[in-house]
Each structure stands twice: as C-alpha cells, then as structure tokens.
Amino acid sequence: MKSSIILKELRAAIEEWARVHNIETSLIEIKPTGFGSSVHVLVVARKGFENWPRYERHDSLFDFVNAKVDRTGSDVFISRLSPMTEEEYEKYEGVEV
C-alpha cells in the first residue's frame, strides 16, 4: 500500500532532519486525523530547539520533508506539522496537537 510506504518515508525523513540539525528527539508521532488520509506530525525535542524560533524550525522541517518525500500520487496529506520543545509539549499536553 502506497500510504504505508509514504508514512515510513515521512518518519525516516523526520529522523534524518533531526540528525542533520543535531536535534535530540524525545517523540516523533505521526497519527491519522480521522479525515481521509490526512495525518498530524508531532516532533518533540529534548535538545536542539533552544535558540530556534518555532516558525523557523517548522519551515525547516516542512521544506526538508517535502524535498525528501515524494507524495505525488499518494493520498497522504500532512494537515498539521508541529515541531516543539519538551516544555512546549508539556504546556499543551492534553490538548490535541
């Protein structure tokens, strides 16, 4: 199934992005939204986001994933992409991210 392959490639691209930027992740979560084949992507970093504004890390991850994962012909749609620190994650814990 093409969707499951795309999701594996998506996770691998996120892991590579973290390595390239020396980010120590504590959580990488790719979960279905329940609407079609759209997914929410959550990346929580233990280290590496300290001096990196949220919008810049979001744009960097978005650009990296789109360059690495060819979703042409796939029905997988990233409806939310959230790279955050552990502190930001704790602040929003319990809130749908």
Sequence positions of predicted segments:
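Short, non-transmembrane amphipathic alpha-helical segments
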Residues: 14, 53-72
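Polar/charged, Gly/Pro-rich intrinsically disordered segments
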Residues: 55, 74-97
